[in-house]
Amino acid sequence: MTKGILGEKVGMTQIFTESGEFIPVTVIEATPNVVLQVKTVETDGYEAIQVGFDDKREVLSNKPAKGHVAKANTAPKRFIREFKNIEGLEVGAEITVDIFAAGDVVDVTGTSKGKGFQGVIKRHGQSRGPMAHGSRYHRRPGSMGPVSPNRVFKNKHLAGRMGGNRVTIQNLEIVQVIPEKNVILIKGNVPGAKKSLITIKSAVKAAK
């Protein structure tokens, strides 16, 4: 059965194991998620649970949103997401970090840091031209394509907005779970800036 929870990226730190191994970890704070809705094939056409994370002030919510969370007897939420293949939960139930344990393998999804408008070297890793000896080609994108189509093909690597994309990193290991602090320590780095929304789910392609 799939397990999943929403959390907030706190930052990175490092821990040492009992054997003295040094492990860089990302700290994810995941306060209890509340099940807001249970979707079924009969009513919605598919099966999933809808969870809310991070309370927000009622003055910032409209009446439909207040009515929706009232069914779960909870406060309005900043983030609402869905998880599939999760069973046995009812509206109003809480999902806490102790559903995971050290050694679990998970997929982590977040929004990558926005870098603004960048050129092809930073954005796509292209090589630059000579920087001296009369060269007039330094950090430009280069050829736009052959003459015969007389146009630029779609998906040509050019300058543009970089970052701010939905990114998933697969098969990351959970190093430690601290239930009393609602904290999960994940080995390595995860996408996103500090205080950004992070989704943690059971790994889809984990080695069996």
Swiss-Prot record:
It comes from the Bacteria. InterPro entries: Ribosomal_uL3, Ribosomal_uL3_bac/org-type, Ribosomal_uL3_CS, Transl_B-barrel_sf. GO terms for cellular component: cytosolic large ribosomal subunit. GO terms for biological process: translation. Residues 117-149 are annotated as: Disordered. GO terms for molecular function: rRNA binding; structural constituent of ribosome. Keywords: Ribonucleoprotein, Ribosomal protein, RNA-binding, rRNA-binding. The keyword Metal-binding does not apply. Signal peptide: none annotated. One of the primary rRNA binding proteins, it binds directly near the 3'-end of the 23S rRNA, where it nucleates assembly of the 50S subunit. HAMAP family: Ribosomal_uL3_B. PANTHER family: 50S RIBOSOMAL PROTEIN L3, LARGE RIBOSOMAL SUBUNIT PROTEIN UL3C. Belongs to the universal ribosomal protein uL3 family. Part of the 50S ribosomal subunit. Forms a cluster with proteins L14 and L19. This is Large ribosomal subunit protein uL3. It comes from Streptococcus equi subsp. equi (strain 4047).
